Amino acid sequence: YKVTFTNDIFTPAEIGVYCQHVCHPENSKFSVILLHDLNQGHKPNIWEYEPWNKFDIGIVPGTFWTNLWSQCACQYYVNPRCGTYELGYPKSNLVSSSELAQCAHALRQKLNLKYDISILYAPSWENDGKEDDFIQALSSLKVNLLIKQANWSDVYDNITENIHQMRLLHEGKYDNVFYIEPEESIMTALAICDLVVSDESNVMAEALMFG
């Protein structure tokens, strides 16, 4: 099979693998569903909001999620047609990969970090000037402050405008504040930091994979 990655959730496929909150498995002859993230909301029964019964196979990342699935499996909408399997979390493969190590090295060189310790600010949603709170609280310390905003589409224009205004306010004003482009993989940003500040996103769970 030829493997294609796409942002178009309506793309027809022989085998479709989905991890979005909103999916369209009817466009695939055979469909596989994974969690969107490890911190997925609506626990313990996320399937009430994001049913799996329209998929052929479901994949959960570990024992915790297997137990959650088992507790809810009495409901028809929890059960994919061919079963649910505990197969791990795909992003964890990146943590020890040479590809990520190379990307992290390149990003460090690009940023030319000033200090040995780096604190990453990586929220899901930029609201209420929280980036400014982060910088004002920590900019006097001998640490690098890394800013990595999520790569939101223009549909969320209020959030993208908040991100834009925060960057205008801070970029170039501090010698220890470094901006990582929103398009950069969050895994690369996590690979070069020592501490993470985030909100309700999966970022914190993924940071734990780096030890």
Predicted features along the sequence, with ranges:
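Acidic, amphipathic alpha-helical patches
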Residues: 48, 134, 185-186
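A donor-sugar binding/catalytic signature common to diverse glycosyltransferases
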Residues: 27-35, 183-211
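Conserved catalytic-core segment of nucleotide-activated headgroup transferases in glycan assembly
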Residues: 80, 87-168
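A generic structural motif
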Residues: 1-7, 141-145, 174-175
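Short, surface-exposed amphipathic charged segments that create phosphate/polyanion-binding patches used
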Residues: 16-23, 31, 97-107, 160-162, ...
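Phosphate- and divalent-cation-binding pockets in alpha/beta enzyme and binding domains
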Residues: 68-69, 130, 206
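Nucleotide-activated donor-binding/catalytic signature segment of Leloir-type glycosyltransferases, i.e.
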Residues: 160-182
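Active-site and donor-binding regions of nucleotide-sugar-utilizing enzymes
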Residues: 1-99
